[in-house]
Amino acid sequence: MPQIHRLSRADARRVAVLAQLLHGERPGGLLPAARRLTLLQLDPVSAVAPSADLVAWSRLGSSYVPGHLRAALDERRLIELRAMVRPAEDIALYRAEMAEWPGRGELTEWQRHRRDWVLANDRCRREILARLRDEGPLPSRRLPDTCDRPWSSTGWTDSKTQLLEFMVQRGEVAVAGRAGRDRLWDLAGRVYPDHPPVPTGEARRERDRRRLRALGLARPRGPEFPVEPADVGEAGEPALVEGVRGEWRVDPALLDVPFHGRTALLSPFDRLVHDRTRTQELFEYDYQLEMYKPAAKRRWGYYALPVLHGDRLVGKVDARADRKGGVLVVNAVHQDVPFTADLAAEVEREIADLAGWLGLEICRAA
């Protein structure tokens, strides 16, 4: 029987913070950070800054500039896969699964539906591949839109966009770059490194291992998340957390590591807080992204930034970058726990650092 590690909540929180590179020792650069975190999530909302850049700044500080991420993508050291920026070498962990799309063995009803829909639109799929072969990389608007069977959509996507998403999952096309906010599409073989695909079972176990290394502590099985799971299967070793029900898996390399915390402002999409259930269980922290709520129903703001202090999440900063006005508007600093004078000063320093990194002046909302 493997050893079951028994952790206090403080132990568990520190493992999570260490894993996410949010402790006192900053990583050596964007690529080492990306390899440890396994991904940087892209999101079109940039109320303060694009989320991937904000996550990198939280780890690297003001030595990081967004051009570093663009350069790494242009040089194919990082690759965009399904709105996640991943180390180029990690793509080999997905290629075998792509080749098996929509899955092996008996398919679920949803898998059959997706397979049949793509087959029904095979003419459009082939036309897209031919256009990319001859002219790529291309933005979506320059690709054929000749789907014979429309995608049943709630308004978030159209047929061509959905077909491109499935073609990504099939390993046929990939994002080759961006022109402004437009993704540029090309044949996957021109974008992905020519590394041998890792067999499916081995690749899933390795992805679980890397995910646990990035999270520090996670459930063996958990709720389903789109694109990137939050659970880790049998990776690591079993653990119990005092005051929290159920079993966890922990990366044993992070146990008994000296912890030196710091204060940090986080993206709402930061992996430390992305799994809201885990955040509540380990940090006893209540958080929701409220930009989709009517203004009158928001508790913390449109794009409130979680505040990490040591191994605790202690508040939220409601801020917005007004780039035309040249200011970072700070609407409120919400204190989940009463701030000491020292903590308040550290939070203000982080806000000042954020404004300086953005090249903006601080403006306090009336």
Language-model features: locations:
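Long, charged, low-complexity, helical-prone intrinsically disordered regions
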Residues: 1-366
